[in-house]
Amino acid sequence: MKFLVLAALLTAGTAASGVSPTALWQFRGMIQCTIPGSSPYLEFNGYGCYCGLGGSGTPVDELDRCCQTHDQCYTQAKKLSSCSFLVDNPYTNSYSYSCSGTTVTCSSKNKECEAFICDCDRKAAICFSKRPYNKEYKPISKYC
C-alpha cells in the first residue's frame, strides 16, 4: 500500500513539474521491456516478502528473491558518495537506458550513481523475466 501511495505521488509530481520520469517509472519501463505486455506495479507490487517498498523475512520463491536482491542493490547504491540521499537516491534519480526487443541496455553516458541504479534495475528486470510468477504469493503477508 505504501508503494502505491508513493507511486501515485511520484506520478502527480512528475506530471505537474514536467520533469523526466524518475527511476521508479524507468524501472517499470525496463520490466515492460523484458516482459512485454506486463503491468509491473499491478503484478509485482506486494508479491512475496520483498516486491514493493520494504521487505523482510525469507523470500517465498525465486521471483521474490529477485526483489530482495534489487532491494540490496539499492542499499548499496545509497552507500555511494555520488548517490546523495535527497537528489540522487535510487527511488528518484533518473538515468538513460534503451530497450531493443526484450534487451535492456544502460547508457554509457550515465554518471556513477545513475549507472549503478540503472544496472540494479536492469538486472532485476532480467531476473523477473526468467522466474515463474506464482499467483498464490500476491498479496502475501503471512510468511514474512
Curated annotation (Swiss-Prot):
Domain of life (superkingdom): Eukaryota
Name under which the protein is recorded: Phospholipase A2
Gene3D superfamilies: Phospholipase A2 domain (1.20.90.10)
Class in the EC hierarchy, top level: hydrolase
GO CC terms, sorted: extracellular region
Sequence positions that bind Ca(2+): Y50, G52, G54, D71
Enzyme nomenclature, EC number: 3.1.1.4
Cofactor(s) needed: Ca(2+)
Post-translational modification as stated in the protein's UniProt record: Activated by trypsin cleavage in the duodenum. Can also be activated by thrombin or autocatalytically.
Proregion span(s): 16-22
Disulfide cysteine pairs (residue numbers): C33-C99, C49-C144, C51-C67, C66-C127, C73-C120, C83-C113, C106-C118
GO biological process: arachidonate secretion; fatty acid biosynthetic process; lipid catabolic process; phosphatidylglycerol metabolic process; positive regulation of fibroblast proliferation; positive regulation of podocyte apoptotic process
Alphabetically ordered keywords of this record: Autocatalytic cleavage, Calcium, Disulfide bond, Hydrolase, Lipid metabolism, Metal-binding, Phospholipid metabolism, Secreted, Signal, Zymogen
One GO MF term attached to the UniProt entry: calcium-dependent phospholipase A2 activity
Subcellular location: Secreted
ATP-binding found in the keyword field: no
Family listed: Belongs to the phospholipase A2 family.
Residues forming the catalytic site: H70, D121
Stretch forming the signal peptide: 1-15
Cofactor: record remark: Binds 1 Ca(2+) ion per subunit.
Subunit structure: Monomer or homodimer.
